[in-house]
Design a protein with these regions (language model features):
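Acidic, small-residue rich beta-repeat scaffolds with periodic aromatic anchors
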Residues: 1-31, 114-187
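Long amphipathic alpha-helical scaffold segments
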Residues: 20-68
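Eukaryotic scaffold repeat domains enriched in small/polar residues
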Residues: 67-72, 81-83, 120, 136-140
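Structural core positions within WD40/WD-like beta-propeller blades
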Residues: 75-78, 132
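Structural motif
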Residues: 85-93, 139-145
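Cysteine-rich, disulfide-bonded extracellular modules and peptides in secreted proteins
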Residues: 88-90, 106-110
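Solvent-exposed strand-loop boundary residues in beta-sheet-rich modules
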Residues: 98-100, 137
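Beta-propeller fold detector
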Residues: 103-108, 155-159
Length: 187
């Protein structure tokens, strides 16, 4: 077990810079790796390399979800998962067929917990006029008009009533605000 002293806890609670907090989390993980490696075969160096990659990437957790070429509209779309400590975003980027950037924007934002987003974002379907994101049971969740995307307009409609409850809005904005501890929470 990794011990965290009262002094470390107090120091953590006073941190306002997110990089300081990230480094605190990493320090705990790294202590845990080294402790576990005393009795188990743990690839500590590999974990440390992953931490460094995360640091080098600006502490961002982003990964490609899907990409699709839509020849009839002359575009390619990329959907990426973007997870921060404050929110999960589904980012849609549109390029022309040669890869020239057209526009990018978030089409879904929710709580930073995979319980909220993982089941809602599973498949990408293209119909004659729409780009649709479905959930794990193929129920439509979000829809974008292909004509909008081809014109560089990034917007979506949430098609699922339950999913809409977890998108920031006037009814839940205080819940989202409670998650922030950085300089944004003091404005």
């Amino acid at each position: 077990m990794v011990h965290v002293s009262d002094e470390e806890i107090q120091s953590y609670l006073s941190m306002r810079d997110e990089r300081d907090r990230f480094e605190f989390y990493f320090s705990l993980l790294e202590r845990g790796y080294r402790f576990a490696a005393q009795t188990h075969d743990i690839p500590v160096d590999e974990f440390l390399k992953l931490h460094q990659q995360f640091r080098d990437g600006g502490y961002k957790n982003e990964r490609l979800f899907k990409k699709k070429m839509i020849r009839d509209y002359g575009i390619k779309v990329l959907l990426e998962h973007v997870l921060t400590q404050y929110a999960y975003h589904l980012r849609l980027t549109v390029t022309d067929l040669k890869g020239k950037y057209i526009n990018s924007g978030y089409i879904y934002t929710t709580y930073p917990d995979d319980i909220f987003f993982n089941k809602n974002v599973r498949k990408l379907l293209v119909t004659d006029k729409t780009l649709m994101i479905t959930d794990f049971i193929d129920k439509p969740q979000f829809e974008c008009q292909l004509s909008d995307l081809a014109a560089g307009i990034i917007r979506s409609v949430c098609l699922d009533e339950n999913t809409r409850k977890y998108i920031p809005n006037d009814d839940n904005k205080e819940e989202f605000a409670k998650m922030r501890w950085d300089e944004e929470c003091n404005k």
